[in-house]
A protein has these predicted regions:
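Beta-strand-rich ligand-recognition modules
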Residues: 103-139, 145-156
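Short, aromatic-rich amphipathic segments at membrane interfaces
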Residues: 159-179
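Extended carbohydrate-recognition surfaces in non-catalytic/accessory domains of CAZymes
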Residues: 3-83
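Interfacial "cap-and-anchor" motif at the non-cytosolic start of specific transmembrane alpha-helices
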Residues: 2-5, 221-391
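Juxtamembrane interface at the cytosolic side of transmembrane helices
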Residues: 192-219
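Conserved nucleotide-binding and Mg2+-coordinating catalytic segments in signaling enzymes
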Residues: 393-415
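First transmembrane helix
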Residues: 172-202, 308-321
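Aromatic-lined ligand-binding clefts that engage carbohydrates, nucleic acids, or primary amines
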Residues: 82-103, 142-144
Length: 418
């Protein structure tokens, strides 16, 4: 039995890391398991026509191709047998692209026009363009321009024409697993916040309610961040800028919630250090929000600041866990936090290997495991403390109350002692 415990404490973490790395390597090798076509440079040079089909398999452009700056032109001639009305939309994606839509050389949409007073790169991952009903026999032309140079593989989704509900339903089916995960994480977070407030208002308030509250914050903020990554969020939002704003704001606030949670597990100077880090993260949110709304500076232009702060926070977190590695709560946190960290690494590999639009799949699953592990431990600790309080009440009741008459005999008890 002792050997088994020693094995669990010494090798379980390495086994978990090995399993996750194996899954990531498997995804890397299976780069062709997704339904897509990777073009050669010769095929790309002759690529000019897209067909509007129900099967919207994407096309991956060659990695390292030297883009000349001229737009990639995709055209589709509408068959005369097709009937269109005013409710028809054209779905176009702009992931790493700028684009312009024409109908018979008449411009109907152009991202060079500022949206809501902000720059053209804000909240433009996906757009539904109303194209009207007079399309029979006409040609839809989509000009796209790469924005990030030749250091990644660009993926292009064929144009999709249909009603708004048809397009939303089609996208929702392709993202259903990620949407379900994000919704569960958000609901889980609100449940934790509610439980934390109930415990805080109870007779036996302790640190476990604070841990549960910060876990709820982490779940809600991360769930919002995941939800803002979905294409369907950019369609159903009343303003396309809202998912963009919440995506960057929640990304900055994740570190605040995690810092406050770790703060409840440490003491002394390290606790003060995490308090200072939380204040710095909050200041970063306020400054970037001011620069974005007042000076109209794009969040993407300030993203490197957030990345630097997250990197410093990651170094601080790992250093804390190494210093306090003998503490059981820190060991447990080290194991649980590796799931979202390694999951995010796998998603980055998928982005550059597959140019996959689902760049948060493994991160979201790792985050879900992290929240479940931490919540399980927090609830178990709270129940243990509650049981101790209950035992103390029972013993006090037996010591100062007559078992037969239920009359308080504290005075006689003290007199006997005296």
């Amino acid at each position: 039995m002792n050997k088994l415990r020693k094995f669990n404490s010494k090798y379980m973490f390495l086994i978990l890391v090995f399993i996750i790395c194996f899954l990531g390597f498997f995804v890397y090798l299976k780069g062709d398991m997704y339904k897509c076509k990777i073009l050669s440079e010769d095929e790309f040079a002759t690529l000019k026509t897209w067909t509007v089909e129900k099967d919207n398999s994407k096309v991956i452009l060659p990695c390292g191709f030297k883009y000349t700056g001229e737009p990639i032109v995709l055209t589709k001639k509408i068959d005369k047998v097709n009937a269109f009305d005013d409710s028809q939309y054209l779905m176009v994606m702009s992931r790493y692209f700028d684009y312009t839509v024409y109908v018979d050389d008449t411009k109907v949409f152009d991202l060079t026009t500022p949206q809501n007073g902000f720059s053209k790169t804000m909240g433009t991952q996906l757009r539904l363009v109303r194209i009207g009903k007079d399309l029979n026999g006409k040609t839809i032309k989509l000009e796209i321009r790469p924005l990030l140079g030749d250091h990644i593989q660009y993926s292009v989704v064929p144009m999709m024409i249909g009603t708004r509900s048809d397009i939303v339903w089609h996208i929702l089916k392709t993202e259903q697993s990620e949407v379900i995960t994000a919704v569960l994480i958000i609901i889980f977070g609100f449940v934790l916040l509610l439980l934390a407030m109930i415990i805080r208002c109870s007779e036996y308030e302790d640190d476990e309610s604070g841990k549960m509250f910060y876990l709820g914050m982490i779940s809600v903020i991360c769930g919002i961040y995941l939800a803002c990554q979905f294409k369907v969020s950019h369609i159903i939002a009343p303003n396309g800028y809202l998912p963009y704003y919440f995506e960057f704001t929640s990304l900055m606030l994740i570190s605040v919630a995690v810092s406050l949670f770790i703060r409840t597990n440490v003491e002394g100077a390290i606790k003060k250090l995490y308090t200072s880090m939380s204040c710095i993260f909050v200041l970063n949110v306020l400054v970037q929000t001011f620069l974005n709304f007042v000076l109209k500076i794009d969040y993407k232009m300030m993203l490197f600041v957030t990345h630097i702060l997250i990197g410093l926070f990651g170094i601080l977190t790992l250093s804390t866990m190494i210093i306090l590695r003998k503490k059981k709560s820190i060991q447990y946190m080290l194991i649980s936090i590796m799931f979202p960290i390694i999951g995010s690494v796998i998603d980055i590999v998928r982005l550059y290997r597959l140019s996959d639009d689902k760049t948060i799949h493994f991160f979201s699953m790792g985050l879900y495991i992290f929240v479940l592990m931490q919540v399980t431990r927090t609830i178990r600790q709270y129940l243990t403390k509650s049981r101790s309080h209950l035992k103390a009440e029972v013993y006090e009741h037996l010591a100062f109350t007559d078992g037969l008459t239920e009359l308080n005999n504290r005075l006689s008890f003290e007199n006997d002692i005296n």
